[in-house]
Structure formats: C-alpha cells, structure tokens
Amino acid sequence: MTLDTAEKQKLIESHQVHPTDTGSVEIQVAMISERITKLSEHLQGNIHDYASRQGLLKMIGKRKRLLSYIKGKDPKNYQDLIKKIGIRG
C-alpha cells in the first residue's frame, strides 16, 4: 500500500519535468495513482477493511483535484499524463 524508495525513485524519473524535479503535480499524480492501484489490490482480498477503503476514496479525490488543476493549466500535458499513467480522464 505504501511505496518503497525504489518505486518512488522510478516514478520520479519517469515523470520529471526537469532534472531536479521531485514534487511537480505530474509526479504527485503518478505517485497517488500507484498507491491507489496497490490499495485497490489490497481491498480485493480484504473486503471488510473499511478504514483502507476510506483512505482510498480520499486519495482518489486528491488525484481528481490535482488532475483538474493540470487540465486547467495545460490541457496537452493533462492528456499526455492520462495516457502515460493509464487512467481515464
């Protein structure tokens, strides 16, 4: 459910805007999307884990807000990010 350092570094390298970028919106969306994927897999086997389900819904909401920010700021970048991460926009 959490990302280890190697996974975070891999996501940062694949979504960097510039060489020293570690926290741009694109990276934040990529990390949240990866956490959502892991948490969804966890909830497949642990149906009654309501606390994790609530955390999942909060993460989905945060990702949605970040994506709407990117969509308003740079629509082309938004489309590229959606395709790269593999989620519906």
From Swiss-Prot:
Residue ranges that the Swiss-Prot or TrEMBL entry lists as coiled coil: none
Superkingdom, natural source: Bacteria
CC terms in the record's Gene Ontology section: cytosolic small ribosomal subunit
Any one biological process term the GO annotation gives: translation
A molecular function GO annotation: structural constituent of ribosome
Classification via Pfam families: Ribosomal_S15 (PF00312)
Keywords noted in UniProt: Ribonucleoprotein, Ribosomal protein, RNA-binding, rRNA-binding
SUPFAM superfamilies: S15/NS1 RNA-binding domain (SSF47060)
PROSITE patterns, per database record: RIBOSOMAL_S15
UniProt keyword RNA-binding, yes or no: yes
Record bears the keyword Ribosomal protein: yes
Signal peptide range: none
Sequence similarity: Belongs to the universal ribosomal protein uS15 family.
Quaternary structure, from the entry: Part of the 30S ribosomal subunit. Forms a bridge to the 50S subunit in the 70S ribosome, contacting the 23S rRNA.
Function comment: One of the primary rRNA binding proteins, it binds directly to 16S rRNA where it helps nucleate assembly of the platform of the 30S subunit by binding and bridging several RNA helices of the 16S rRNA.
Protein name listed in UniProt: Small ribosomal subunit protein uS15
Gene this chain is encoded by: rpsO
